[in-house]
Regions:
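Conserved N-terminal structural module of periplasmic/extracytoplasmic solute-binding proteins
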Residues: 1-100, 360-363, 367, 421, ...
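Short helices/loops that flank or line small-molecule/ion binding pockets
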Residues: 71-89, 93, 102, 174-178, ...
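Hinge/lid segment of periplasmic solute-binding proteins
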Residues: 98-153, 167-171, 281-287
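Short, solvent-exposed loop/beta-turn-alpha elements that line the ligand-binding surface or hinge
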Residues: 114-127, 205-226, 285-296, 429
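Extracytoplasmic/periplasmic solute-binding protein
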Residues: 141-152, 171-230, 254-259
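Glycine-centered hinge/linker elements that transmit conformational signals in sensory
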Residues: 212-246, 272, 281-286
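Extracytoplasmic/periplasmic substrate-recognition and gating elements
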Residues: 274-355, 403-404
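C-terminal capping/gating helix-and-loop segments adjacent to ligand/active sites or protein-protein/ligand interfaces
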Residues: 365-444
Length: 452
């Protein structure tokens, strides 16, 4: 007997009868190696489904997170990266925003997926969400395809952050000055190291170009990033903190905090954010000196086909299966398939009402129909908020956030280590921001050249 459950809430039990088969009657399948560092639940389920349904291919997963140790969580990530760079390359990569995909692409290790999309009779560019894919392109080529997406951003209260034409470090400091003394930009628990990693991952494509082999850390934009990080504590002293815990939402509403860094993954997230902030939420993003929006797309998993893949048609067949309507509609995050996104939006904006046995709406004491909640969400010390239909204004807001976002979260552990090492002197006060940025520029430039 087997038991299966799915992320859309469905489940089933099956009684299976196993019958011995002649080995000669079993059609061999081409095995394709998929390497990852941790495997998303949705993707794992799709691999199982694909392996059962495909007569020609079988995806074999090697999860390098099993090499993580108590002393080094990233040991498996280092091992995977080392193997890829040395030529031991899998057929498919599943990236959970931790692999240096742009570096692999610059080395010629990854296939451009646009030709596969364009040649597929059941798929086309206009069937996919445009903005996340545009942000992943390198010189017009698409080396990784997300199964879903969210938007990493920063939220503020409209009464505080409205009225700014730009959102630079100076603008953030000006907005902060409107709050009571002692207010912080983000929650007081965030440290310099956490915020530095956050900001670099969101802005990596602004400072590094693997195709050209160049970087731009000795710049006003990067120095502004370091200056933004410096006011955060090096470590947070939890033992000396006698105050009761307050969530980001509570601190925002109480004037103790300017911004809340978060990610929008679904229409439920959108509704909750507006409700928790009394409909005064503004998705202003992180400060950027170049005038662009300080948001970045993210994904639970992006998929790549390597140039050494033993059967690229088979690899694409698997990736193509993640774009099927049923799979896309079942995802927790925003679907990358446009029709599934639109279907989810329509469902989120449709309000259901209580009815009697005959299907007639039940009215409250004021003669109004009684809306049905689709569930509830809570965060930290915030009370449970019942979820109802998303309004047109809220939908327009999230679409504006998506349409204005041009970056995708990108992470390279080696580059992050260099930045952390050289930024430490500035953050501790022993170096100027100019000295730190020049050292980072020099070391990252050398690292890029060594990787060619």
């Amino acid at each position: 007997m087997t038991y299966e459950s799915s992320n859309d809430g469905g489940s089933r039990q099956q009684i299976l009868v196993l019958a011995r088969a002649d080995a000669d009657s079993v059609q061999p399948k081409t095995e394709l190696a998929l390497a990852c560092f941790g495997l998303d639940y949705n993707l794992r389920s799709q691999i199982v489904k694909f392996n059962r349904s495909s007569a020609d291919y079988r995806i074999v997963v090697k999860d390098y997170s099993e090499y993580a140790t108590d002393d080094d969580y990233n040991a498996g990530l280092t091992k995977l990266n080392t193997e890829i760079i040395s030529g031991n390359i899998p057929d498919i990569l599943a990236n959970s925003m931790l692999l240096p995909i742009r570096q692999y692409a610059a080395k010629g290790l990854l296939e451009d997926l646009w030709p596969y999309i364009d040649a597929d009779p059941e798929c086309s560019r206009d069937k996919l969400m445009t903005k996340p894919l545009e942000s992943l392109q390198t010189d017009g080529k698409l080396y990784q395809l997300p199964i879903d997406f969210g938007v990493t951003t920063a939220i503020g209260l409209g009464k505080v952050v409205d009225g700014y034409d730009t959102w630079t470090l100076a603008d953030v400091n000006d907005a902060l000055s409107k709050l009571p003394e002692g207010a912080t930009v983000f929650n007081k628990y965030y440290t310099q190291a956490e915020m530095l990693q956050y900001c670099v991952a969101m802005n990596a494509d602004s400072f590094m170009n693997w195709q050209d082999g160049t970087c731009n850390f000795d710049s006003d934009e990067f120095r502004a990033l370091l200056e933004f990080v410096k006011p955060f504590p090096a470590e947070y002293d939890w033992q000396s903190d006698s105050e009761e815990y307050e969530s980001d939402y509570s601190r925002l509403k109480n004037g103790k905090q300017l911004l809340y860094p978060t990610s929008l993954y679904s229409f439920d997230d959108l509704y909750y954010t507006f409700a928790a902030l009394n409909n005064d939420a503004r998705f202003v993003g992180f400060p950027r000196e170049d005038g662009s929006t300080g948001n970045a797309f993210n994904s639970d998993a992006t998929l790549c086909i390597t140039t050494t893949c033993k059967d690229k048609a088979g690899a694409w067949a698997f990736i193509r299966s993640t774009l099927e309507e049923d799979f896309q509609k079942s995802l927790w995050n925003f679907p990358i398939l446009k029709s599934a996104f639109e279907a989810n939006a329509k469902e989120a904006m449709t309000q259901e009402y209580e009815t009697d046995a005959d299907g007639n709406q039940i009215l409250d004491e004021n003669g109004n129909p009684i809306p049905i909640s689709t569930g509830g969400m809570s965060y930290g010390d915030e009370p449970m908020i019942e979820l109802y239909a998303v309004t047109q204004e809220q939908y327009d807001t999230v679409m504006a956030v998506i349409d204005s976002t041009t970056s995708f979260v990108d992470y390279d552990q080696n580059v992050m280590n260099i930045i952390s090492d050289e930024a430490a002197g500035y953050l501790a006060g022993s170096k100027t921001v100019e000295e730190a940025s020049k050292l980072i520029q020099s070391r990252v430039s050398l690292y890029i050249q060594e990787q060619k």
